[in-house]
A protein has these predicted regions:
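FIC/Doc superfamily catalytic core
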Residues: 2-249, 253-298
Length: 298
């Protein structure tokens, strides 16, 4: 809400445009000085049109600073945290200001981009145009195997549900997610029973007999209170999930899908972090390979 207010000091009037907003249960304000003369109704509307976006950004900056101070982390510096919080509050403001049609178009575009980014790291990835074509036609474009089409359609459905599913994340829900992704193939929803490796890495995942315990430990860590930023926690969860490698196949698709849900719940667009999925392949059991490579908007 943007409105005109007057302040009086030593008998002199000063006029400001003020935007009020709620943060953490309290009302905060940002303002812009207009001068000592009160604008008429026409001029006030012109000034509102001129300065509303500026005040909106000032409110976002204020909220980002206050919010970033609540996290304690060994991984991200202050500016990176601030950039993430700016992104979160900017996404929230854009969503509030968008029309219903704009939201629908953006959701459709982001869904294609996110699924393309997820599948780009899988074996036999599809092109962006392939995925768009499958979405438009709900059938296999010429030359594409039916299994890939079904995988894309499953990812489309699960992408719409993943935020809610991550809200109740547990071993059973992860198994169900894997089962739903590979529905009809007979290979979904079961923890691996054989040894595994990480392609291109010297790191060896835990033996099959320890997978269930490792997964339970990771989930316990996820649900424990933490001073880390949600983005960091999502990155660390994803990284460790890939190390555990709980399934015979589909670990990358499931891990990235879960991380998408974590980012969405944190108010961060999953499409902003597609580069992360390429960087994760550089790491074994360390976080250092990510430092300096994740580009956080400032």
């Amino acid at each position: 809400m943007v409105y005109l207010t007057r302040k009086t000091t030593r008998g002199q009037h000063y006029f400001y445009l003020v935007k009020s907003f709620k943060y953490d249960g309290r009302v905060e304000k940002v303002q812009r000085y207009l001068g000592s003369e009160e604008p008429d109704e026409f001029e006030l509307e012109r000034l509102k049109q001129m300065h509303t976006n500026e005040l909106e950004l000032a409110a976002i900056e204020r909220m980002a600073h206050m919010s970033s101070e609540t996290y304690r982390t060994p991984y991200l510096d202050k500016e990176a945290l601030l950039g993430l919080e700016r992104m979160k509050f900017l996404n929230r403001a854009i969503h509030r200001l968008q029309t219903t049609d704009e939201k629908v178009r953006e959701h459709a575009k982001n869904r294609v981009a996110t699924i393309y980014g997820n599948m780009a790291l899988s074996s036999n990835p599809l092109t962006y145009e392939n995925i768009e074509s499958i979405f438009d036609q709900d059938r296999a474009p010429s030359g594409l195997p039916l299994s890939k089409v079904l995988e894309v359609l499953s990812l489309r459905r699960l992408h719409g549900e993943i935020s809610e599913r991550v809200g109740r994340l547990g071993k059973r829900s992860i198994l169900k997610l894997h089962q739903d992704l590979f529905e009809g193939t007979g290979k979904g929803g079961v923890l691996r029973e054989n040894s595994a490796n990480l392609p291109g890495s010297a790191f060896m995942p835990p033996p099959a007999i320890l997978v269930e315990d490792e997964l339970e430990g990771l989930l316990q860590w996820w649900h424990d209170p933490s001073p880390l930023h949600p983005f960091e926690r999502a990155v660390l969860f994803h990284h460790r999930f890939q190390q555990v490698r709980p399934f015979e196949s589909g670990n990358g698709l499931i891990g990235r899908l879960i991380m998408d849900g974590m980012l969405i719940r944190a108010g961060l667009s999953a499409t902003e972090f597609s580069n992360y999925f390429f960087l994760v392949n550089l790491a074994s059991n360390r976080i250092e390979p990510f430092e300096g490579k994740l580009q956080i908007p400032m």
